[in-house]
């Protein structure tokens, strides 16, 4: 506990003497009094009961919706109780990076199993131990595709706007040119894409399903990019992968996505995790930690951090990225979730999302909230709103329902997951019809 105990009076006196002053006021003599804090930095200490009471009052200011129909990157999914029980184990709740394999086999094995499941989910050869979130995973993947004469990144305009902004921010600092391909009828405009794909194109990034919930023509987009010898980065929803073809089966080179649906609560925006997986050919360009399986001195199975020459503790500023230890707990949460659900459970969750979203879309269309895009969708979709979208949002909020996300004056992006009951969806219709 010594490191948590403030310096004693004698220690302070000794330190002041070492720099040639007698008091703290002497030490800060060069600081103008006009910038001095007049109030204490923190209040006086309080009892545990007083602190809990104060924090409870702060929490009560939040609006917590039990009925949620909003996605747009963060999704309300059921989290099996076993997931929390596993990750709350003291051995996992640490920010320590497991460099010393001989004392970290439990954490290393857990991360290895997470990587294995991400590879199975995406159909790829190798996965890292995750990065900060889905947006940073997408941006990092762009750098994996860079070559000396092929640097341009082509991004589908149907991608999540926040992901696009993150990619642009990352690429600006490295001088990587970015071209945004416009949307057409809710999908990537293939004619515009054909123009954007030139000989200097390093990669194409698109999402499946895209921001509007619409399913893209993945095979065509991938073929168009490969015809120009560009790599393909596919942003995917991990729950949707319970039903759809994997990026590996479709021919993508890199698969990335937001891992929040895999057992992480929405938590006002974080912490989340970004999963990344690629073909073996691109393995050495993957950022972040990679755990590998090997044999110990006795020939037994063991786990280590492998391919470490890519990382910042060896290559410093030339490392492929600067990903720190905090993501390990989120990755292990996703691993625990995938283990608890299994392939059949994940497929069942995906089927429920699909069926409930289509039920909601049909019910909304019946009261004038018609689909904007007549295209296949998974669990998100855009509707027109006969009243301003902000007004529809408020009507539902007044009844304790979080509506879809207004994305235009008269357009709303809806989402339904396995958490939404028929009664909740019928309540949405009743409120919008003015029956409640």
Q: Language-model segments: which ranges?
A:
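N-terminal entrance/gating region of PLP-dependent enzymes' catalytic architecture
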Residues: 33-112
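Compact, charge-rich alpha-helical regulatory domains located at protein termini
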Residues: 1-37
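Short acidic-aromatic active-site loops that bind/stabilize oxyanions
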Residues: 101-111, 127, 131, 207, ...
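Buried hydrophobic packing segments
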Residues: 115-118, 122, 137-145, 334-338
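Conserved C-terminal alpha-helix-loop-beta "cap" of PLP-dependent enzymes
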Residues: 344-427
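Short loop-beta-helix segment that forms the pyridoxal 5′-phosphate
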Residues: 99-103, 119-139
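Conserved PLP-enzyme active-site core in the AAT-like
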Residues: 2, 15, 106, 136-299, ...
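Active-site C-terminal subdomain of aminotransferase-like
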Residues: 262-367, 371-374
């Amino acid at each position: 506990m010594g490191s948590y105990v403030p310096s004693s009076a004698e220690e302070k006196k000794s330190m002041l003497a070492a720099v040639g002053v007698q008091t703290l006021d002497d030490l800060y003599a060069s600081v103008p009094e006009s910038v001095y804090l007049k109030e204490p930095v923190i209040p006086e200490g309080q009892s545990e009961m007083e602190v809990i009471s104060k924090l409870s009052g702060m929490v009560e200011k939040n609006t917590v919706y039990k009925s949620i129909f909003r996605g747009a990157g963060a999704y309300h999914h059921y989290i099996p109780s076993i997931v929390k029980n596993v990750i709350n184990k003291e051995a996992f709740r640490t920010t320590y990076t497991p460099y010393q394999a001989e004392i970290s086999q439990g954490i290393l094995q857990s991360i290895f199993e997470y990587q294995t499941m991400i590879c199975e989910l995406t159909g790829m050869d190798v996965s890292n131990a995750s990065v900060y979130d889905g947006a940073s995973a997408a941006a990092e993947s762009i750098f994996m595709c860079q070559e000396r004469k092929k640097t341009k990144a082509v991004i589908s305009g149907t991608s999540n706007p926040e992901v696009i902004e993150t990619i642009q921010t990352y690429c600006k600092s490295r001088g990587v040119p970015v071209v945004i391909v416009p949307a057409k009828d809710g999908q990537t405009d293939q004619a515009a894409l054909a123009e954007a794909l030139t000989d200097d194109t390093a990669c194409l990034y698109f999402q499946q399903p895209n921001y509007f919930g619409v399913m893209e023509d993945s095979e065509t987009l991938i073929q168009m990019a490969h015809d120009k010898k560009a790599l393909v980065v596919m942003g995917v929803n991990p729950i949707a992968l319970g039903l759809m073809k994997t990026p590996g089966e479709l021919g993508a080179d890199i698969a990335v996505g937001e891992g929040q649906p895999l057992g992480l609560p929405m938590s006002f925006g974080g912490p989340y995790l970004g999963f990344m997986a690629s073909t073996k050919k691109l393995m050495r360009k993957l950022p972040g930690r990679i755990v590998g399986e090997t044999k110990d001195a006795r020939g037994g199975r063991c786990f280590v951090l492998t391919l470490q020459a890519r990382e910042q503790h060896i290559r410093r500023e030339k490392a492929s990225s600067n990903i720190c230890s905090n993501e390990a707990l989120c990755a292990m949460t996703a691993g625990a979730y995938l283990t608890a659900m299994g392939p059949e459970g994940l497929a069942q969750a995906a089927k429920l999302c699909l069926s409930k979203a289509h039920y909601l879309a049909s019910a909304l269309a019946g009261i004038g909230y018609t689909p904007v895009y007549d295209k296949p969708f998974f669990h998100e979709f855009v509707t027109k709103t006969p009243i301003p979208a902000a007004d529809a949002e408020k009507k539902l909020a007044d009844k304790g329902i979080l509506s879809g996300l207004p994305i235009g004056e008269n357009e709303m992006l809806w989402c339904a997951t396995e958490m939404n009951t028929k009664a909740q969806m019928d309540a949405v219709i009743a409120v919008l019809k003015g029956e409640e």
